[in-house]
Amino acid sequence: MITFIICLVLLVVAYFTYGKYLEKVCKIDTKAEVPSSRLYDGVDYVPMPRWRTFLIQLLNIAGTGPIFGAILGACYGPVAFLWITLGGIFMGAMHDYLSGVILVRNDGLSITEIVARYLGKGAGAFMRIFSVALLLLVGVVFVVSPADILSTRFELIDKGWWLAIIIAYYFIATLLPVDKLIGKVYPLFGFALVAMALGLLGVLLFGDYTIPSMTLENLHINKENLPLVPTLFITIACGAISGFHATQSPLMARCVNNERECRFVFYGSMISESIIALIWAAVAMAFFHNDGGVSAALAGHTPAWAVNEISNTTLGVVGGILAILGVVAAPITSGDTAFRSARLIIADMLRLEQRTKWKRLVICAPLFAAGVALTFVNFDIVWRYFAWTNQALATVVLWCIVVYLHKERHNYWVAIVPAVFMTYICASFVFVSTQFVGMGAVPMAYVWGGVATIVITLLMAYKILRSRKALQ
């Protein structure tokens, strides 16, 4: 229990300390004109209250990530607490906050355009294709997974109808101005997501459950089957650091009222997500403690099953409702904003303004046609690569932040250390995982990961040294 409490306190304190320090690093200007007012179009560039942009950002970046990922991460033992806490504070929240500030200072453009601006046209072109494909994949999977769950719970309605209903909702949400549907409905889901986490926190603190504290013996369980490096850092993405967040942040970067709000909206939402992930990891460890641990309990089951079991048992009838929220509403709200982000990336790439409905339709129609077609594809193999691509995207954004801070003569060490670390995680995963080279957790795999990291770091150092002169 004490490890969990310490990590929880550290996350809260970090918002008021490290988050405040990052504000000084960025030299926040409260008088600077922001995109929501300067580029107001009534569709995507719309100023909204700070509390609303925070809740929408939280729901956009969360989805099922801090729930399912944390439950799977709990298989590693209490070491998951460390990664969620330290990763959330120094990597994830920093990544979300600094990329959010950069987006606000660059007209709220899509992250792909920011990468092109700071890492070069080649990197930008790759990121455009990579990001649209990733967002399309996320959107489609978040159509299929809730449809599966709903068709199981409500057998009178066929899965095909659920697919049609969800896709129709996605299309409308992607097409409408951000304040008409997302701005009104999502804060309610955001409140519910927070309420679910707080309810489980109450159960942990005051219920008859024991959260394992971290010791040398249980620091990392299942060492033989679950190598800590790099798989833990790939498994727990949302809650620690996630590149998907950078694709979602432009939505709210176009809605903040001033630069000061960025810490609350971007750093605060990521810290909140880390707290949610920490709670779910702790709940999973405590709930399945007498069943042989999380790994044994999940054998033959999915994280969605675990959410349902935990929620119904610990929170009763209310828990059943919240379980539906966690495994249905959360992915749906991330899925539609994934499609919306894809629309914005394509619009920014084509320099196609989105004020009029027909120009939004020009992008939405083929985008959703591709999405509908992909719902009939088996994603079992492709989806295995999502976790790695998500962290690879985060790594690219971290290097982009480094270039920006170096160019602006700010303290770039806050980003370069996480960038090098995540480069090593992604590189070593390529050599260790059977999804790629498949060498396994042998010393040589880690050596090759280190060599790849050194090469990439040297290339980025060359880019950084050139960037200041090129961008002046």
Report each predicted region and the residues it spans:
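Hydrophobic alpha-helical segments and their helix-loop junctions in multi-pass secondary transporters
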Residues: 139-165, 173-174, 193-220, 404-412, ...
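Membrane-helix boundary/coupling elements in multi-pass transport proteins
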Residues: 65-71, 107, 131-147, 234-256, ...
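Membrane-interface "cap" regions at the ends of multi-pass membrane proteins
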Residues: 10-67, 231, 258-261
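Extracellular loop-to-transmembrane helix junctions
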Residues: 1-16, 73-103, 112, 446-454
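Extracellular/periplasmic helix-exit of transmembrane alpha-helices
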Residues: 205-214, 267-309
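Loop-to-transmembrane helix boundary motifs in multi-pass membrane proteins
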Residues: 121-125, 132, 160-164, 268-277, ...
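Hydrophobic, membrane-embedded alpha-helices of multi-pass small-molecule transporters
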Residues: 49-65, 203-209, 218-280, 325-334
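Helix-loop-helix module between adjacent transmembrane segments
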Residues: 15, 91-107, 111-175, 237-241, ...
